[in-house]
C-alpha cells in the first residue's frame, strides 16, 4: 500500500543564473560537493545527465554502511527541473537483497526545481517525495532510528544545508 505523504520541500534564493546551478545538479560527480546529508561518497562514473532515462550510480554511506545507489532520471528540463528515482537494493552485493527487486525504482524521488528571478537569481527548491512508496520501502526508509527521515526535521536540515552548499559552489 502506497503512503499518503506530502513531499518534503526546502527552498533557497541563490544569486546565480539557473543555467549555472542546473549544470552542477546535472553532474553527479558534483553532488558530493553540496550534499548536506554527508551520505554521498562520489559518483561511480564521471558523466553528466542529459535526458530522461539516463542512469547514474552513487557511492553512499549511512549508519556505518557503504553501498551503491542506482538512480533513474525521471524528469529533465534544462535550467528548470531534474528528478531521479533511486532503485531498491545495492546491485554490488547479494546479501540482504531480494534479487527480484534490485535495480527496480523504489517509488521515491529526489529532485530540484529551479525558478529564475531575473537573469542572475534563482529560487532552488529541493524535493524529496516518498508518496508513492510501498509500506515496506517506507519502513526501510525509517530504519536505523529514522536518522534522516523520521519526522522530517533532520531531513529538512540536511536539505537546507545542501542548498546552502549549492549556493556557495554556484557563486564561486
Regions found by a protein language model. Name each.
Residues 1-52:
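Hydrophobic ligand-binding cavity/cleft-lining segments
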Residues 3-5, 51, 64-66, 103-107, ...:
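Short coil/turn motifs at beta-sheet boundaries
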Residues 5-13, 18, 55, 68, ...:
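Intrinsic-disorder/low-complexity, polar/charged segments enriched in Ser/Thr/Lys/Arg/Asp/Glu/Gln
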Residues 10-12, 44, 69-75, 107-116, ...:
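Hydrophobic/aromatic beta-strand elements that line small-molecule binding cavities or substrate pockets
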Residues 13-17, 59-61, 87, 115-117, ...:
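Solvent-exposed residues in well-ordered beta-strands and their adjoining turns
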Residues 21-25, 31, 56, 73, ...:
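Hydrophobic pocket/interface hotspot
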Residues 43-103, 161, 168-172:
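Glycine-rich portal/gate segments that line the openings of hydrophobic small-molecule binding cavities
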Residues 92-160:
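Beta-strand/loop substructures that line and gate deep hydrophobic ligand-binding cavities in soluble
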Amino acid at each position: 500500500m502506497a503512503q499518503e505523504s506530502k513531499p518534503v520541500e526546502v527552498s533557497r534564493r541563490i544569486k546565480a543564473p539557473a543555467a549555472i546551478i542546473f549544470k552542477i545538479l546535472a553532474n553527479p560527480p558534483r553532488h558530493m560537493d553540496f550534499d548536506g546529508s554527508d551520505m554521498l561518497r562520489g559518483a561511480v562514473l564521471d558523466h553528466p545527465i542529459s535526458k530522461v532515462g539516463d542512469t547514474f550510480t552513487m557511492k553512499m554511506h549511512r549508519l556505518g554502511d557503504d553501498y551503491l545507489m542506482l538512480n533513474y532520471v525521471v524528469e529533465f528540463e534544462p535550467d528548470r527541473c531534474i528528478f531521479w528515482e533511486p532503485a531498491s537494493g545495492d546491485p554490488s552485493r547479494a546479501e540482504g537483497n531480494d534479487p527480484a527487486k534490485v535495480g527496480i525504482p523504489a517509488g521515491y524521488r529526489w529532485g530540484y526545481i529551479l525558478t529564475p528571478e531575473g537573469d542572475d537569481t534563482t529560487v532552488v527548491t529541493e524535493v524529496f517525495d516518498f508518496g508513492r512508496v510501498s509500506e515496506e520501502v517506507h519502513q526501510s526508509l525509517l530504519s536505523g532510528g529514522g536518522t534522516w527521515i523520521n519526522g522530517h526535521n533532520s531531513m529538512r536540515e540536511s536539505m537546507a544545508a545542501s542548498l546552502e552548499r549549492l549556493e556557495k559552489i554556484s557563486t564561486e
